[in-house]
UniProtKB/Swiss-Prot annotation:
This protein's name: Folylpolyglutamate synthase
Documented EC number(s): 6.3.2.17
Keywords (A to Z) from UniProt: Acetylation, ATP-binding, Cytoplasm, Ligase, Magnesium, Metal-binding, Nucleotide-binding, One-carbon metabolism
Residues annotated for ATP binding in this entry: G68, K69, G70, S71, R305, D323
Cofactor stoichiometry and binding remark: A monovalent cation.
UniProt: Mg(2+) 1 binding residues: S92, E161
The species this protein was found in: Arabidopsis thaliana
InterPro entries attached to this UniProt entry: Folylpolyglutamate_synth (IPR001645), Folylpolyglutamate_synth_CS (IPR018109), Folylpolyglutamate_synth_euk (IPR023600), Mur-like_cat_sf (IPR036565), Mur_ligase_C_dom_sf (IPR036615), Mur_ligase_cen (IPR013221)
Deleted gene: phenotype: Vegetative phenotype does not differ visually from wild-type. No obvious defects in root development. Polyglutamylated folates still detectable. Has significantly reduced methionine levels compared to wild-type. Combined loss of FPGS3 and FPGS2 results in seedling lethality. Seedlings fail to proceed beyond the expanded cotyledon stage, exhibit an albino phenotype and are unable to thrive beyond germination. Fpgs3 and fpgs1 double mutant exhibits dwarfed leaves, late flowering (approximately 13 days after wild-type), reduced fecundity and delayed senescence.
Residues reported in the UniProt entry to bind Mg(2+) 2: H189
Length: 492
């Protein structure tokens, strides 16, 4: 029966996720020779999976960067789909379900296909493991799985987002992409990539391939110098692209998306010329973008970035503004987007509103860099948070399951109390400054730590029910995991 089939598939899928979870290892900054060894193993894995020839023939757009690489890939995939190409998109991380990482023609892969492709790869690799050749780690396996899916499904173009860094990233096993892109660079994953922009840029530039054209956006001088040096050594024609004109409608919100869209346009223009679909004149932007580019840009969609979602129980009283920003620069972009949305809403809506921050970040981040950038940029734009809420993420990091329990899993709250202290310190500093210039000061801010996301959402809903005349506008940021947890919890 259909229900029994669905139940059987659901059970198989959960078993698959459990097996995938077994590949998760703790990540840290490995010695260079260890990273190099793990990277070389990827070529062995491709051979075991009999994917060497198929991968070498794939037409690939490869994108690295600190910020905006996922958005750039999303724009590029949407544009190329408008040209009738069968697309394969591999991105990370996922928010709710691991299948989000694998998209065929813009649609995440089905459970049935995912299960079948997974076990095909898993069993073949498991048969060949030894002390010298262990099973691939979690992300390496996902990249190999992407290659298996996209080659078997015979896509016309693969858009690959680098997972971390570039030089030793699992996606960099490809030898001859059609074109490469580097989105905005900044400080992130420094414990792995290095503590200077020069070191980080060198890792990202590791995706450059001899003679393969590459594009980037305007970068800090230190980073740009390294990118140019790496490109010159490999005879790569590296070009810097400008943001798209802000009159162009984009499917992804935020002013920073015009920069990502500009990079995507350059990548797609080059790709289409290289495979002979469009000639150079057909993509001359001086006469405006081709209609298919305009359509692709305006219809692009990426979950968890600049996303507005009403609460499932109290849609009129609580609205969530979701953005997975987790670097200092992306915090500023998030603040600008959020502030703009608040102002536009105030112009349209007579109901009084209150802005609330719901925040967490991973312990590898530095909240003393993130929270001040977010707060000061919002204040610059005329938006103040009346309350701030700090919670742990729900997701279990050694478990992939899309059915991750969203109950009240209690952990040590020391990290969240630390976030609260940083926030309150910022508030006290502003209060002192305001008291000197304004005798009235401003309404006292409040901050809270809750043991879990469900408890925090219940608290928000209780407050909203008691204050029907006020609309709560909740910015959820600091971690894509937190954004995914909230989406899962409110069942959106």
């Amino acid at each position: 029966m259909a229900t029994e089939d669905d139940g059987e598939l659901s059970a198989r899928y959960q078993n698959t996720l459990d097996a995938l979870s077994s590949l998760i290892t703790k990540r840290g900054r490995l010695a260079s020779n260890n990273q190099s060894h793990r990277f070389r193993l990827l070529f062995h894995y491709l051979k075991v999976l009999e994917l060497e020839d198929a991968v070498s023939q794939m037409k690939i757009i490869h994108v690295a960067g600190t910020k905006g690489k996922g958005s750039t890939c999303t724009f590029a995939e949407s544009i190329l789909r408008c040209y009738g190409l069968r697309t394969g998109l591999f991105t990370s991380p996922h928010l709710i379900d691991v299948r989000e990482r694998f998209r065929l023609n813009g649609i995440e892969i089905s459970q049935e296909k995912f299960v079948n492709y997974f076990w095909c790869c898993f069993h073949k690799l498991k048969e060949k493991t030894s002390n010298e050749v262990p099973m691939p780690t979690y992300f390496c396996f996902l990249a190999l799985l992407a290659f298996k899916i996209f080659t078997t499904e015979q896509v016309d173009v693969v858009i690959l987002e680098v997972g971390l860094g570039g030089r030793f990233d699992a996606t960099n096993v490809i030898q001859k992409p059609v074109v490469c892109g580097i989105s905005s660079l900044g400080y992130d994953h420094m414990e792995i990539l290095g503590y200077t922009l020069a070191e980080i840029a060198a890792e990202k530039a590791g995706i450059f391939k001899s003679g393969v054209p590459a594009f980037t956006v305007a970068q800090p001088d230190e980073a740009m110098r390294v990118l140019n040096e790496k490109a010159s050594k490999l005879e790569v024609n590296l070009q810097v692209v400008e943001p798209l004109d802000s009159s162009q409608r984009l499917g992804l919100q935020g002013e920073h998306q015009y920069l990502n869209a500009g990079l995507a346009v350059a990548l797609c223009s080059t790709f289409l010329k290289e495979i002979g679909i469009e000639d150079k004149n057909g993509l001359d932007q001086t006469n405006g973008l081709p209609e298919k580019f305009i359509s692709g840009l305006s219809n692009a969609y990426l979950m968890g970035r600049a996303m507005i979602v009403p609460d499932s129980e109290l849609p009129e009283e609580i609205v969530y503004y979701l953005d997975g920003a987790h670097s200092p620069e992306s915090m500023e972009a998030c603040a600008i987007w959020f502030s703009k949305q608040i102002k536009q809403n105030q112009e349209r809506n007579q109901k009084r509103s209150e802005q609330i921050l719901l925040f967490n970040c991973m312990s590898v981040r530095d909240p003393s860099l993130l929270l001040p950038r977010l707060r000061s940029k919002c204040i610059d734009q005329g938006v103040d948070f009346k309350r701030a809420v700090f919670v742990p993420n729900v997701s279990v990091y050694n478990q992939v399951g899309s059915s991750t329990n969203v109950g009240t899993r209690v952990e040590s709250m020391s990290w969240q109390f630390g976030l609260q202290r940083i926030w309150e310190s910022l508030a006290r500093g502003e209060a002192k400054s305001n008291s000197k210039s304004d005798s009235k000061g401003k309404e006292e801010e409040k901050s809270f730590v809750f043991s879990s996301l469900p408890v925090a959402v219940d608290w928000l809903r209780d407050n909203a029910r008691q204050s029907k005349q006020v609309r709560f506008q909740v910015l959820v940021t600091g971690s894509l995991h937190l954004v995914g947890d909230l989406l899962r919890f409110i069942k959106k």
